[in-house]
Amino acid sequence: MTVFIGIYKAIYNYEPQTPDELTIQEDDLLYLLEKSNVDDWWTVKKRVIGSDIDEPAGLVPSNYVEVADVISQVKAVYDYHEVQNPDEELVFNENDTFDVYDDKDPDWILARSISTNQFGFIPGNYVEPLNAETGSAVPPSQPAAAAALPPPIATSATSPPAPALTAIDISTLPPPPQHSSKTNAQASDSGNRDYADKDLPDLPPNKPSRSNTETNEDDYYDAPPTKPARPNSTSNEQDTRQKARSRTSYYDQHYEDDAEDYRSSQRDDDYNDSEPSGELRTWNVAEIEGRKKRKAKLSIGNNRLFFSPQKGSPQDWSVDKLISYDNEKKHLFLEFVDPYKSLELHTGDNDTCKEILSVIGEIKGASRDPGFKEVEMASKSKKKGNVLYDFTAESNDELTIKQGQVVYIINDQKSKDWWLCELIDSGKRGVVPSHFIEPIQEKLTSSHTGGLFKSIKKFAKGGKSSKASDDAYSGSWEDDGMEGSTERRSRSGSYSTRKRASSTTSKKELPNPKKSRIWEDRSGTFKVEAQFIGCKEGKVHLHKANGVKIAVAAEKLSDDDLVYVERVTGFSLDKYKVRGSGTSSSRQDPRESERERRRRLRENDEKDRDRRLRERELNELQKARQLLDNERTKLQEQNEQPPSKPPRPSSGMGNRSRSQSTKDNYDWFEFFLNSGVDVSSCQRYTSNFEKERITEDMMVDINDSILRTLGLREGDIVRVMKYLDKKLGRDVSPQTAVVAGGMFSEADGSLKNNNSENQSSVGQQLLPNNPDLVSNTPIDDDTWTVRPAAKSEATLAPKTAEFTGSMQDLLDLKPLEPKKTEQLPIANLAVTESVVPEPNLKNLEPVRTGNVVQKPLANTLTGGATLVPLDPFKTGGNNVLPVTTGFVMMPFATGGAMPIQRTGGIIVPQTTFGTNAAGGIMPAQITGGLIPVATTGGLMPQTSFGVTPVANVVPLQRTGGAVMPIATTGGANILPQTTFNLPPSGTVLPIQRTANGLMAANTTGGMMPLNTTGGMMPLNTTGGMIPLNTTGGMMPMNTTGGVMSLQRTGGMMPQTSFGTQQMTGGAMNMMPQISFGAQQMTGGAMNVFPQTSFGAQQMTGGAMQNPNMGTMQNPNMGVMQNPNMGAFQPKSQFGMTLQRTGGAMAQPIMDAGVTGIAQGVQNMSMAQPLQNQPTGFGFGNGPQQPVQANIYNASASNPFGF
């Protein structure tokens, strides 16, 4: 259902007297929105053609309008149910008929539905005109339409004057409201309320009486609760109407920026100089276009200028859009932009033109200067609030505020969570959270601007009713007339609802201090400060400083006050002035009064000019003060930065400037480029140097450690240090670097010697004296591992201090002195040291392969319980271990089970099958001297013919003795396993020569050999794959009577690493352990067998793995430990068996009937010397190599001393 009650047209022109009234012209189409039940003022909206033009709404006298004529009829051809704006559009079905009132807009036709009797708009393309028969019935439809609207017809019937009133004197009638010369307040002042219902036939009717009490715009639409939102809810109407057409109310365009403020403060009076909330000011002007003048209105308020022409759409601009303003007498010239408009207005008199210019100058200056704005706001009674917390705006409609600020609360009713506030200094508006603002009580802001508003406190607390406000008319003047009070009371009683709302609003209103003046009665007894409102019916209406409005009889005022009223209104009040008693004086009174009036006008003008000058000076002072305050505030903000804020841009600029200055001091990128560093690394190094703020003067202190800390790579460190030495001119001559070595290495990469100081040095007689061989020997520095820098030994000569970091250095150093259980006598040490033989230089051609001078290892006794250390050796690939080629007595066990030794033939050394050799030459066992041959009772040992050995060259070992003793191992004698005619695979294996031609060889491939001795002989798994203990399958079986200790033979033997020294004598009988640098004991009191971790198979059958079960594996008991378990067992030059820790582990042979002669020590020096053996790559039956091995010349790069 639409909001239109009817369609009317204006029959007279009407000029509004108050802002809530509507300007209408004759024949204007009007939509009736509401009829008043208490007076004859109706709320209508004017029909305006065009989608972009707003349709104004307001009040008009009911006797100025009549029902519009129906111009045609149409019929619906489609159903129309989906309306876009139900407040203005009609819902209809097909074949419905309509009365058309206006079809000037082809898209939307203004019509009335005959079926539902509703008024509104229908789409033009949904209807079609009726046929001729229907069209002929159009004129009679007008009475039908009038009959359908009884209230408008009844009203119009009562409005026309009776014919009997034609005899009334025309001079007594008030002028018509549309008179052009009566645009000011006197047009309504002279209107007699007694003639509201009477009029002459040839004159337009008077507008109905209206109340003097303020009428709020909301009052006209709050009465009927069932109706939709009225034009006071401009935003709601605008939102709904703009969906279909841009038809909004008249006041939406004028006050859309401050509608709430205007509605809460506008007053209902009949004078053009009334100012709602002391802010909006309106003047009736005439727009001049060429030679034509058109009536218009100019309104200024809320920092906006509103121009409403009589014909045409109203326009408004903000103050900043006004680019120029000037006047020439009564003509006012304004020029706007966005949109551009140049106006020439005629104000009617010079005073009005000056007043308009003054107001424009004030708001223009206020928009440019916040200080003036603050002064202007101080003269208003706006609700203020204190800001409790800081709030930063995150959207365009929000307002940024700081704690401690005072803001104006513009609207706190629309939303309880968000309030519309305005900054006092800048005038910027926006919404802020309501809980961020604490409203200030009215009493705190009611006494500003001196003593002008002293009485507002009492007025604000009074809570007076409208009746008390009416009684105040006689508060300051004894004889104030109250003509028309009966009529006022009757009107106030007829619409008490609106009066209550108006009285509530009036309590908050105060007069404009700029228009307030001192009024004095004729006797000089009473004075009051008030603002002139208007003059009507011989009464002067004033607005006192306390907010009370009074009406004073004109004859009670002084002549000065009457002259002021005449100047403002333009009416003559001479009849109310004091006149002389004489006839001559009475004839001269008009001239004298005119002179007096002009004199007073001049005085008033001068006073006003002086007042404006003072106000301008005050504004300039406050502007300067505000500027100083702003500068002071900025300085304080810069000096007192809150700690929670991020660093100021000045700090960031300082950091960048310092960083830039550092960059400017020295170009590290160029430095690294000149040093030879790769370009991809120069930037990273440069960034690291700049982060650490390394400057050019710090180059002298840069060393390897600093560069390494700064992230430089090793190669780049060398380049940078060389460049620094060259740049700084430092001495780069070779010097012995005094640097600390590693934990186990020296400065040149060799292993440290941790033996005691009493170790003897290598005898000079054992060193080669051929300088050519030494000098021509190539040196390969990359043979072994990387050599870290370390501190060199002070005891070594510079010639012998160059180590290569190889495993050979272990043989060149003294072994650690173990913790001995018995102290060996010095005499015995001397005896053993004297046993060292001289090398046979005939068969040996020593070759120096390095600059390292070997120190002889100390000999240890093999008898008793003395712990004998085992020389360390490297257990990886590329192991070239020296062997003794001299005459060395080999100890052997005479009782119990003896381990199987290689004794001759084309001997394939035992290789570490199952383990990956890292390459190089595998050292061979020393088999010289008296090598015991195990008699196996006639059983031939299993040979390893056709078994492929490890793909490395194993040097041929030649045994020196002529007679090889045969060791009886209890029971049957077992012949050693031989490898005669074994085809080597992958490399050339040296052949061991034996003295007696009978060498036992261990099988290195095929099935595992079975020891069939009567004693306890272990099954040695020397084959290619990992040996398996035959505990039911192919596991070695102990055929001895005692309990045999099952050894772990599967997997890999634990590999020893650098610095490992193995003890093979003494009470300890430990197998070597795995970790690097550990000192391993292979003999001793504890028979701890190390556990291997690479593919080992644990013996789970037979006896326990503990060697101590059954028979102790103590070397004192004559039990020999077989070192030849799948790996080649090297021999040391001091007669001790070097235990190979790779491959399968050996099983100790246990026998209860052994003697403790041998002590488990192999290769002890015996009476028979060992012969030098060929160490080349040929076999034993081939020609001798020209170069022979010399263990005393062995080094890291030449382990055999070629």
Swiss-Prot record:
GO cellular component terms, A-Z: actin cortical patch; actin cytoskeleton-regulatory complex; endosome membrane; nucleus; plasma membrane; SLAC complex
Taxonomy, superkingdom: Eukaryota
UniProt keywords, alphabetically: Actin-binding, Cell membrane, Cytoplasm, Cytoskeleton, Endocytosis, Endosome, Membrane, Repeat, SH3 domain
Membrane listed as a keyword: yes
Amino acid composition bias (Low complexity), ranges on this chain: 136-167
SH3 domain span: 3-70, 71-132, 380-442
One Pfam family it belongs to: PH_SLA1
Region (Disordered): 133-278, 462-518, 577-609, 622-661, 749-770
SUPFAM superfamilies: SH3-domain
Primary location: membrane
Bias type Polar residues, positions: 179-190, 652-661, 751-770
Free-text function comment from the UniProt entry: Component of the PAN1 actin cytoskeleton-regulatory complex required for the internalization of endosomes during actin-coupled endocytosis. The complex links the site of endocytosis to the cell membrane-associated actin cytoskeleton. Mediates uptake of external molecules and vacuolar degradation of plasma membrane proteins. Plays a role in the proper organization of the cell membrane-associated actin cytoskeleton and promotes its destabilization.
Family: Belongs to the SLA1 family.
Protein name: Actin cytoskeleton-regulatory complex protein SLA1
Protein species of origin: Vanderwaltozyma polyspora (strain ATCC 22028 / DSM 70294 / BCRC 21397 / CBS 2163 / NBRC 10782 / NRRL Y-8283 / UCD 57-17)
